């Protein structure tokens, strides 16, 4: 796993589950969740989040629109690492 950026935090699964339970799985939901991820980790320029069953695929796109290779398949209940 890549080391977390000093300014980044780990999003606990309880916070993410609470957010997902109260939201519909729409493009607005993913946009809001992406904004939350960006607010937690300032190094993420553009992010996309795809919900696949109970897994989240989170990846970042760098300034040159190339995937940085920092990717996680997130399963519950482990802590959700969203930062570079």
Curated annotation (Swiss-Prot):
This is Uncharacterized protein C1B2.06. It comes from Schizosaccharomyces pombe (strain 972 / ATCC 24843). It comes from the Eukaryota. The lineage of its organism: Eukaryota, Fungi, Dikarya, Ascomycota, Taphrinomycotina.
């Amino acid at each position: 796993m890549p080391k977390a950026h000093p300014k980044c935090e780990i999003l606990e699964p309880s916070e993410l589950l609470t957010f997902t339970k109260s939201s519909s799985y729409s493009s607005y939901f993913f946009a809001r969740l992406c904004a939350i991820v960006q607010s937690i980790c300032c190094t993420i320029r553009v992010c996309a989040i795809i919900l696949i069953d109970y897994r989240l695929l989170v990846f970042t796109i760098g300034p040159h629109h190339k995937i940085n290779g920092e990717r996680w398949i997130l399963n519950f209940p482990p802590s959700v690492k969203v930062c570079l």
